[in-house]
């Protein structure tokens, strides 16, 4: 499903490699991977142990090329779970950034779903395109809507079992959201309150949800006020803190390091259409 394979040495150090890499060298020696599929234990020419396995999206996210600070898995996972994003849904995202959240959204909606991701910066969209291509979220040669540019993907690995469910656009959702009957809108923008009215028009009134991700509480307050003004309901804001647990022969304890504040996640539902009983009688 991905254009990568993962090589892990006996110390736990990970190397994300393109599928077509046949040999790879580290301080522990050279590993020969020619004609070898993932799922095996290998020895370097120095006798050190390596595992060759398929990477997860988490492995790729940690090592992919970035143009901006990306959302972390702790926040991405919560967004998908709390918004209830599922197979077959249509999700609009803005902005794309490096494509980290886009990858996970693609995975969540599956082959029968669709992710339309907007960014106003062509240079960011092009970096994201490369990342999305290598996880099978878009096809080779696929264009970015709104960008008059052809892409030469000849050197990229063909992914036959990709999801191919992402559409990239250059556009400003503050001005317009082209899509209608959208299930979920996810906004990673500094001023989502300027998008709320357009989001309200685009969302499916039966099940539409909106998610915003913001670093500052003042931004959250302004966003929530606008959501309420536009009739959005079931509004909740969260902060996710991550701390790993260390397990050793001595005992079990929380790690002294933790991932604290990264951003605030606000989730809300679009207001349903009011039912006019008089019109119903007529």
Swiss-Prot record:
Keywords: Methyltransferase, S-adenosyl-L-methionine, Transferase, tRNA processing. GO terms for biological process: tRNA methylation. Its EC number is 2.1.1.219. GO terms for molecular function: tRNA (adenine(57)-N1)/(adenine(58)-N1)-methyltransferase activity; tRNA (adenine(58)-N1)-methyltransferase activity. It comes from the Archaea. S-adenosyl-L-methionine binds at residues 98-101, 119, 172, 188. It is an enzyme of class 2 (transferase). CDD domains: AdoMet_MTases (cd02440). InterPro entries: SAM-dependent_MTases_sf (IPR029063), TRM61_C (IPR049470), tRNA_MeTrfase_Gcd14 (IPR014816). The keyword tRNA processing applies. Pfam families: GCD14 (PF08704). It catalyses: adenosine(57)/adenosine(58) in tRNA + 2 S-adenosyl-L-methionine = N(1)-methyladenosine(57)/N(1)-methyladenosine(58) in tRNA + 2 S-adenosyl-L-homocysteine + 2 H(+). Gene3D superfamilies: 3.10.330.20, Vaccinia Virus protein VP39. PROSITE patterns: SAM_TRM61 (PS51620). GO terms for cellular component: tRNA (m1A) methyltransferase complex. Belongs to the class I-like SAM-binding methyltransferase superfamily. TRM61 family. Catalyzes the S-adenosyl-L-methionine-dependent formation of N(1)-methyladenine at position 58 (m1A58) in tRNA. Homotetramer composed of a dimer of dimers. PANTHER family: TRNA (ADENINE(58)-N(1))-METHYLTRANSFERASE, TRNA (ADENINE(58)-N(1))-METHYLTRANSFERASE, MITOCHONDRIAL. Contains a large catalytic C-terminal domain that binds S-adenosyl-L-methionine and a smaller N-terminal domain that may play a role in tRNA recognition. Domains are connected by a linker region. This is tRNA (adenine(57)-N(1)/adenine(58)-N(1))-methyltransferase TrmI. It comes from Methanocaldococcus jannaschii (strain ATCC 43067 / DSM 2661 / JAL-1 / JCM 10045 / NBRC 100440) (Methanococcus jannaschii). The gene is trmI.
